[in-house]
Amino acid sequence: EAQAGDAADGTSAGDPRYAVGRVQRDLGRSSVGATWAERRTDGSGQGSAGMDATLFFTPTFGFTGQAVQSYGAYDEGTWAYFLRPSYDSPTGHAHVRFSYFGERFGDNVNAVGFVRDDNRRELDSALEKTVWFETGPVEQVEYGSNYNVYWGQDGTLRDWSVDQSLDFELRNRWSLAASHNVEFARFEKDFRNRATELELGYNTREFSSVGMGVEFGRNFDSDFHLVTASGRLKPTPESSLEYQLERLVLDPDPESESTWIHVVRASQFFTNDLYLQLFYQTNSVIDRRNVQAVFVYRYAPPFGTIQVAFQRGTAAFGEASDQGNTLFLKVTRVF
């Protein structure tokens, strides 16, 4: 029996209803469109309506833009838009983007979506270039950069960041990479963060490869050093081994986050339809030791399978694990 206040379709009068609409027109490689989304509760609507365009003027020069008007609890500071001209070629990329988010845009639009942050005016640009060499020890050099700054609508500087990177691929299968980041971040106080990373690898375009890296700098008032190493090997055509190491040291370390992390993976294919996969991970700071084993038999390939999995240690990402044992069984069949 329907109660007072219930709708004819059986939903409560206070239950939210959602509606979404989208129209788009393609113009060759380009397109223009309009989108509307709304959540309606107790007779009042909250959501957004906007237009967007992706335009290509030449094979390499294009433009992307969007403008959105939100509505709901707030009537002012409810606009958002961005403008982004760009250049793209097989060996290069460049763009400049300006974004605007009103002070109350997120308060309205997050009823039907998710806006990470509003109350900002943001300027972003990037430049990437790859150069190939036909002779000599260097085969390829790749440069990348990104620049970002944003302010609050009142003109207060909130953040800026500069990223630079330079990668070298050598003909003897060695690779070198260097990157540097500097950042200003304003929270309860002003922070100046920086990070420099150096990487060395061998045969990284293939599965069997090794690599190592070191990163150092300062992050939110703590000096840090991060050392990484990895190796991948195929002892036989049917098996593979992988190992990863991370060593993080923070100074000062008020939250005791300095740690050793080890990750081991192994696979063994007995046939194309019968194989075993193993995974092991430790994290010293949270005393985490996880083991996973998965045995798969495709009795009716490709979709008919029997899978048996064992797991020791369960936890959300970054949390100490419960060292309990869990056994899973899964059987699939497509008719």
Protein language model annotation of sequence segments:
Residues Q3-D6, R29, R40, P59, ...:
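Short loop/turn segments at secondary-structure transitions that flank enzyme active sites
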Residues R17-A19, A49, T78-Y81:
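Short alpha-helical segments and helix-capping/turn motifs at coil-helix boundaries
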Residues V23, A53, L200:
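Conserved hydrophobic/aromatic pocket- or pore-lining residues that grip, position, or stack substrates
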